[in-house]
């Protein structure tokens, strides 16, 4: 069986609230760290979420 190309990643809020999203990305085509602007319900606004490894 072939090795999967998608890996699970954790998107941590930059607002410091501790809120995170879990998503997946193709590690072969997207080699740089992912930064997305998403909604943080704890801060109640849209903030940047940066990629981190799932522990």
UniProtKB/Swiss-Prot annotation:
InterPro entries, per this entry? Ribosomal_bL33, Ribosomal_bL33_CS, Ribosomal_bL33_sf, Ribosomal_zn-bd
This entry carries the following GO cellular component terms, namely: cytosolic large ribosomal subunit
- Source domain of life is Bacteria
User: GO:BP terms for this protein?
Assistant: translation
From the UniProt record, which GO molecular function terms apply? structural constituent of ribosome
A Pfam match is: Ribosomal_L33
For this UniProt record, give its keywords in alphabetical order, as a comma-separated list: Ribonucleoprotein, Ribosomal protein
Establish whether keyword Mitochondrion is in the entry: no
Record family assignment? Belongs to the bacterial ribosomal protein bL33 family.
**PANTHER family, alphabetized:** 54S RIBOSOMAL PROTEIN L39, MITOCHONDRIAL (PTHR15238), LARGE RIBOSOMAL SUBUNIT PROTEIN BL33M (PTHR15238:SF1)
Protein name as it appears in the record: Large ribosomal subunit protein bL33
What taxonomic ancestry is recorded?
Answer: Bacteria, Pseudomonadati, Pseudomonadota, Alphaproteobacteria, Maricaulales
